[in-house]
């Protein structure tokens, strides 16, 4: 299956600025991207990165600085070669097993909702479906599929629901991560702080 992996590499993960400077944020973002590419390939997917700035990874990269909706829409214009999947580059918890569930679910459109109402991954098999990544996009994608007469299924997966944007998301990577992104955080001095309330991520400067 062709798998499009959008990547924002120009100024990534600005909400992690309390933890990391700009160079570090880019390094961390690339480590997550590489984890996603590994997971996609492990289940037989054929990943291709679409980025707003050049990035060096073990996959074909196309530079396209248009908004996400336009970029993905362009990738879906031709489904003649079979279904197309879209998997976001910041799904640091994604595993081959989670992606296999997504890819193997039988529907015209299969979506993995993100926490907060986003759409973290899609499989599209119907030419009349289009995307809209603004706001609570999972609601829009349900509606678009219904209006286009597409069957629609959702994959309820914690590993696909967590897209790493906020400092609180680093906790999930430290607890559940299995790849480069977790290793990068540990090497950067990020650790769990257990207090009387929720566990938090803190950074020890080295």
From Swiss-Prot:
It catalyses: (2S)-2-phospholactate + GTP + H(+) = (2S)-lactyl-2-diphospho-5'-guanosine + diphosphate. One of its GO terms (biological process) is F420-0 metabolic process. Pathway: Cofactor biosynthesis; coenzyme F420 biosynthesis. One of its GO terms (molecular function) is phospholactate guanylyltransferase activity. Its EC number is 2.7.7.68. Pfam families: CofC (PF01983). It comes from the Archaea. Keywords: GTP-binding, Nucleotide-binding, Nucleotidyltransferase, Transferase. Disulfide bonds: none annotated. Belongs to the CofC family. HAMAP family: CofC. Homodimer. Guanylyltransferase that catalyzes the activation of (2S)-2-phospholactate (2-PL) as (2S)-lactyl-2-diphospho-5'-guanosine, via the condensation of 2-PL with GTP. It is involved in the biosynthesis of coenzyme F420, a hydride carrier cofactor. This is 2-phospho-L-lactate guanylyltransferase. It comes from Haloferax volcanii (strain ATCC 29605 / DSM 3757 / JCM 8879 / NBRC 14742 / NCIMB 2012 / VKM B-1768 / DS2).
